[in-house]
């Protein structure tokens, strides 16, 4: 199966998540060759709920996003992401759940939610920490990984190439 996001800025919404969940019944490739692999979760959509004080709907949406990311991570079939361009926030979180990432060299990746006062919620924080825990520096000092990831996420830092994104 192949999934390609097609919303404005390839922002994630319920339809995107449904497509991802349903596609994991077979090996899956998540790809997008536009300027954005995915600019993350559709914040305009969630702000509409906030404007109506409908926080239950925001909670439901976030939970569904978390379930979708977990579904990708623990799929019985291989999941491959092939991102290019902007891969931010929720788009990053979808990408890091994959078994394999074949990234274009023209990429900007990161968890940028803190820049707008939000906390990443799709499992990207734990995936980033897991990768940093495997570095030689973290094996010598386990606090190294935690501090490095806290710095990256806390400041909404991005990497501008696949090699820069590696721990």
Question: Which stretches of residues belong to each language-model region?
Answer:
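C-terminal accessory/binding modules appended to enzymatic or scaffolding proteins
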Residues: 1-15
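A structural preference for short, pocket-lining loop segments at secondary-structure junctions
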Residues: 2-3, 17-56, 63-82, 104-108
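A broadly conserved detector of short glycine/acidic/proline-rich loop/turn motifs that flank catalytic sites
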Residues: 7, 34, 132
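Conserved acidic
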Residues: 8, 12, 57, 64
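Short, exposed beta-strand "edge-strand" segments with a Pro/Gly-rich flavor and a Y/T-containing core
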Residues: 8-11, 38-41, 157
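Short strand->helix junction
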Residues: 9-10, 36, 86, 118
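Conserved strand-to-helix beginnings and helix N-cap segments that scaffold or border functional pockets
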Residues: 14-17, 40, 92, 122
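Conserved catalytic cores of soluble enzyme domains
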Residues: 58-61, 66, 70-167
């Amino acid at each position: 199966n192949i999934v390609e996001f097609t919303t404005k800025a390839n922002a994630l919404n319920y339809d995107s998540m449904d497509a991802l969940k349903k596609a994991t019944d077979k090996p899956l490739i998540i790809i997008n060759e536009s300027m954005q692999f995915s600019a993350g979760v559709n914040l305009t959509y969630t702000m509409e709920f906030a404007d109506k004080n409908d926080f239950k709907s925001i909670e439901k949406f976030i939970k569904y996003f978390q379930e979708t990311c977990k579904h990708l991570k623990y799929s019985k079939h291989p999941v491959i992401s092939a991102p290019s361009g902007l891969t931010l926030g929720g788009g990053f979180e979808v990408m890091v759940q994959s078994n394999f990432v074949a990234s274009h060299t023209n990429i900007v990746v990161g968890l940028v939610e803190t820049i707008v006062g939000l906390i990443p919620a799709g499992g990207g924080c734990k995936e980033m920490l897991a990768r940093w825990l495997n570095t030689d520096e973290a094996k010598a000092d386990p606090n190294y990984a935690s501090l490095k990831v806290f710095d990256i996420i806390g400041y909404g830092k991005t990497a501008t190439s696949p090699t820069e994104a590696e721990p």
